[in-house]
From Swiss-Prot:
GO terms for biological process: protein histidyl modification to diphthamide. Required for the first step of diphthamide biosynthesis, the transfer of 3-amino-3-carboxypropyl from S-adenosyl-L-methionine to a histidine residue. Diphthamide is a post-translational modification of histidine which occurs in elongation factor 2. Keywords: Cytoplasm, Iron, Metal-binding, Nucleus, Zinc. The lineage of its organism: Eukaryota, Fungi, Dikarya, Ascomycota, Saccharomycotina. GO terms for molecular function: metal ion binding. It comes from the Eukaryota. It is found in: Cytoplasm; Nucleus. This is Diphthamide biosynthesis protein 4. Residues 82-147 form the DPH-type MB domain. The gene is JJJ3. GO terms for cellular component: cytoplasm; nucleus. Belongs to the DPH4 family. The DPH-type metal-binding (MB) domain can bind either zinc or iron ions.
Length: 149
């Protein structure tokens, strides 16, 4: 499932004018008269819903919160082979949450972990734990190593 940000082709930090510009552009390029391939599937209602949600500050805040929660439920305890490895020390701690800006899309504090998430970590052979987490703004997954204090 792609995010509303991906539907409109904007970053999570996009301003209202940027959202409006992206919305107009996406509608124009997705219009059935503008598409050469008649079998191409155009989801104009999805574009409209994405814009309506993101342009309203209250809806956007709620949507962002849902994105974070759904990302956390996607399964953290996988092998992690081939993923970039970060230490929990690389994260900022604030209000019972560890966060880090994404190294790929640079979305601010888009990789988040809570104490509950860390309790689900997988023990490693070095006496620590590993957990796999996804950026809330793009498809990047990283492996986070940490130790109990």
């Amino acid at each position: 499932m792609i995010s509303y940000y991906e539907v409109l082709g904007v970053t999570p930090e996009a301003s209202i004018p940027e959202l409006k510009q992206a919305y107009k552009s996406k509608l124009l390029t997705s219009h059935p008269d503008k598409i050469d391939n008649s079998s191409a599937q155009v989801d104009i209602p999805l574009i409209k819903q994405a814009f309506a949600t993101l342009v309203d500050p209250t809806s956007r805040k709620q949507y962002d919160k849902q994105l974070i929660e759904s990302s956390k439920l996607k399964g953290f305890n996988i092998n992690g082979g081939g993923l970039d490895i970060y230490s929990l020390d690389d994260f900022e701690f604030d209000n019972d949450e560890w966060s880090k800006s994404c190294p790929r899309c640079t979305a601010h504090k888009s990789i988040c972990l809570t104490e509950t998430d860390l309790e689900k970590g997988t023990p490693d052979k070095d006496g620590g734990f590993d957990i796999i987490v996804q950026c809330n703004s793009c498809s990047l997954w990283i492996q986070v190593k940490y130790y109990e204090e």
